Amino acid sequence: MNLFSSFTLMTFSILLYPILLSFTDQYNNNLFPNHVKTSIICAFLFSLIPTLMFINSGYDMIISNWHWMTIQTLNLTMSFKMDMFSMMFVPVALFVTWSIMEFSLWYMHSDPYINRFFKYLLLFLITMIILVTANNLFQLFIGWEGVGIMSFLLIGWWYGRPDANTAALQAVLYNRIGDIGFVLSMAWFLMHSSSWEFQQRFSSQNSSNILPLLGLILAAAGKSAQFGLHPWLPSAMEGPTPVSALLHSSTMVVAGVFLLIRFYPFIKNNQLVQSIIMCLGAITTLFTAICALTQNDIKKIIAFSTSSQLGLMMVTIGINQPYLAFFHICTHAFFKAMLFMCSGSIIHNLNDEQDIRKMGGLFKTLPFTSSELTVGSLTLTGTPYLTGFYSKDLIIESANTSYTNAWALSITLIATSLTAIYSTRIIFLLIRSKPRFVPLSPINENNPLLNNAIKRLLIGSIFAGFLITNNMTPMSIQQMTMPWYLKLTALIVTILGFMMAMELNNLSLYFKYKTTSQHVKFSNLLGFFPSTMHRLFPNTNLLISHNSASTLLDLIWLEKSTPKLLSSTQLMDSTLSSNQTGLIKLYFLSFLLSMLMVTMLII
């Protein structure tokens, strides 16, 4: 086990080398991005050794070698939890990041601040690894906030664009809502046990309390873009494509799901919390799949597919299968990163065009990228024997084993069929149809940095599911029998989705609607959620605040209470006391009244 811990710490040390190098003169060198890529390659190779040792032994290990401080009865230490989740996730994250870094060398080659960009990407990965390997809430919170800060810096990388700045702020604000739940949960754990260590937390008797679990659900909903806190995820597409690939595959968006997986010993004993997670995930996976149907921005379609898959992971946790949720995290990383990199290649070759209606016929002009985009889309839908099939099929099978999951299962099956529909739509509009882009676009995909990066992820999208299935503990699963129609549910639903997509494509060639239907508007406008939450409620609050300030403060207090009251009182007094009006009728009336009074007095 000493060798195990040594290689693990060596992996982390290799990743820190480029960060330390950035404080020297080498940071301004053009070779700094290559140093970062080489460090990630070495870290990936070193991480395979402790992973294979763990697969062989199957024993968890905790590395605790630095005591930071003691606050009364609270001990803050830096400790790493080397269990199945961390040991399987770290090589996957490093492998995917290796490909993204190599892709970034091609995609960001003309950026004047490419060295800083690579440094931020590396910090993004390091903070995610800190989150995954943390053995206490304090260290996990460092990684949690780290991925949030780095996402803000990377989403707003092109800070000269107002949309990028807005998207970065939106990501921070929505995640702040989730952070409130995380901080409150940390405070509850500290008050009731005086410890943030996972071993002490899981062995305590307070696991039945629902309050900290609700805080963790809120935190996971914010970080993993669940329904209600989801608008920041498609808006984050304003960042560079390598950022989108890393953010959606193996870093920030899966952090919320991983948080619930890490705290699963609490969740498994609380059926109400499991039901909340299952319902939240089911609503998210269906709503975002509906939104993806009519989007025209290729990156936003893939972003909504990510949110839909995150909802599926939440459903998996809700049906008492955290290991399957983690398995789907690992398989999802490969094909989602490949989809973003393929879309980035297409966007780059078409002069930053992202509208799929202005593409088409790319199989002849970009055959390599188009082929891998097709494979990635098929993997996303759960095509048999590709990586996505191994996890999605098991999830739907597990949901089929209990009638209590019928509601979530039905919604998940509908979302799975919709996944096949919008994936087929991408394939039809980008590859099969006629070219609709500017003919003068300089198209060239013959770059080894681009091709090698996507090839590695293509191999992962085909074989990673099989490899992880056969090396993920437990090695053998309990035998069970079920009807053949339940076993083939995922495949049947996917085929139905493909058939529906083909039928809709044929109908669109012959039928033209004069007006857009309300259903299409609901999908295209994201369920009217941004216009409601970002416009209606803020404008209503501003209007109420403006009217309250102008009516209550200005008109009543400042005008009628002090200066205007004095002026009106003085005007009334002066009017009553003054008899010089200049009107002959009033003078004659006053004369008559005076004569009348004198006459009455004499008589």
Swiss-Prot record:
Spans traversing the lipid bilayer: 3-23, 39-59, 87-107, 117-137, 140-160, 171-191, 210-230, 241-261, 272-292, 301-320, 325-347, 360-382, 411-431, 457-477, 482-502, 583-603
EC class name: translocase
First and last residue of the signal peptide: none
GO molecular function list: NADH dehydrogenase (ubiquinone) activity
Catalytic activity: a ubiquinone + NADH + 5 H(+)(in) = a ubiquinol + NAD(+) + 4 H(+)(out)
Record carries keyword Lipid biosynthesis: no
Pfam family membership, one: Proton_antipo_M
Record's bilayer topology term: Multi-pass membrane protein
Any one biological process term the GO annotation gives: electron transport coupled proton transport
Keyword Transmembrane helix: yes
Any one GO CC term of the record: mitochondrial inner membrane
EC number, UniProt record: 7.1.1.2
Cell location: Mitochondrion inner membrane
UniProt keyword annotations, A-Z: Electron transport, Membrane, Mitochondrion, Mitochondrion inner membrane, NAD, Respiratory chain, Translocase, Transmembrane, Transmembrane helix, Transport, Ubiquinone
Function, in words: Core subunit of the mitochondrial membrane respiratory chain NADH dehydrogenase (Complex I) that is believed to belong to the minimal assembly required for catalysis. Complex I functions in the transfer of electrons from NADH to the respiratory chain. The immediate electron acceptor for the enzyme is believed to be ubiquinone.
Family: Belongs to the complex I subunit 5 family.
Protein name, per record: NADH-ubiquinone oxidoreductase chain 5
Lineage, broadest ranks: Eukaryota, Metazoa, Chordata, Craniata, Vertebrata
Designated gene of the protein: MT-ND5
